[in-house]
């Protein structure tokens, strides 16, 4: 058994060789599972042919059984109708704590998240939405939808210019544009809405692969299950043909203990 708890691309792309040497793989490394679909399918097929096991529940939502629930639905003959999910504890912390400048500017809330250890060492990685994109690819593929990055509609949280320069320059850009963040917040709050960075996969016969996939900031009302999601929690709503009232999975989507327990469960399985 080989356990990959890194974020290394070098290690992630050695899984095929590990299979050939008789190892099964448990991974919380998202890189190879969200790689181009051609590589992903080759990896899965190789594991089956060789008789190895590849498990990666913790790549999405730490120990939350999001991927397992999707997989069980599909394997039972059910069909996914809609998945809506908040998959970044960092972004959820930021948007559940930012109040239009009251209690701190957007830049200050991001810095608090970094100081608390909720962000990557470089917080730009979190605010780029890249991590959420990878997680959406993984859960979509688990649902049997073979999408790549180009198939996802991406509404960037921040303009590309925010990511030029170093981290200090990034924080300076956030501070300079506080009025933009405050206006976004005020517009949503005036309608009784809250902002959440949402990843979704929705059945749509007119879309490629029969599903529409997107990530972006959304304003949701009080009837939505994601409305009261707070702190660093993740949540996923899974609606299927058999379950038109969606299954809601919610809880800590990150953390050393949570991730370790998920990895251990994959090892045992």
Describe these PLM feature segments.
Residues 8-21, 30-57, 62-73:
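Rossmann-fold NAD(P)-binding glycine/threonine-rich loop
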Residues 56-60, 84, 99, 122-130, ...:
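Hydrophobic alpha-helical scaffolding
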Residues 38, 61, 65, 104-108, ...:
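Conserved active-site and cofactor/substrate-binding residues in soluble primary-metabolism enzymes
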